Amino acid sequence: MSGNSQALIPPRKRVDGAMVNCRFNKSIKDNGGADDVYEQAAVTQTKELFGCTVNDLYRETGGKKGRRDTLPQPAQEAYMVNESLAANELDRQIGTLGGESQDEVNSQILASVEQTSKQTRKWLPW
């Protein structure tokens, strides 16, 4: 490696749930997602991963709504795995999703998130 090789190596840091969620949301945005699609993506994946609503998940686990760090570790891990996989799939689809309206674009994004969530669910122990 030459003298400038260190500049080519990006800095590393521990990845956490917030970072994974940010990347997931960026992938939604990069595909043209807007309006309430971010909230709906959370609702969709929660339904597929846990079989309940977001409100039920937080209530039944004693978590504080809007704070995933208050959920049990297995739930946090499930969100992280799913959002990482869903972001990868959405990144693969950049430039291929479209429609006549924002609702159509959002629907395609949500369909992708739902499909990924169904696949992820098969690997979860519950």
Mark where each language-model region is.
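Positively charged, phosphate-engaging catalytic surfaces used for nucleic-acid and nucleotide handling
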Residues: M1-W126
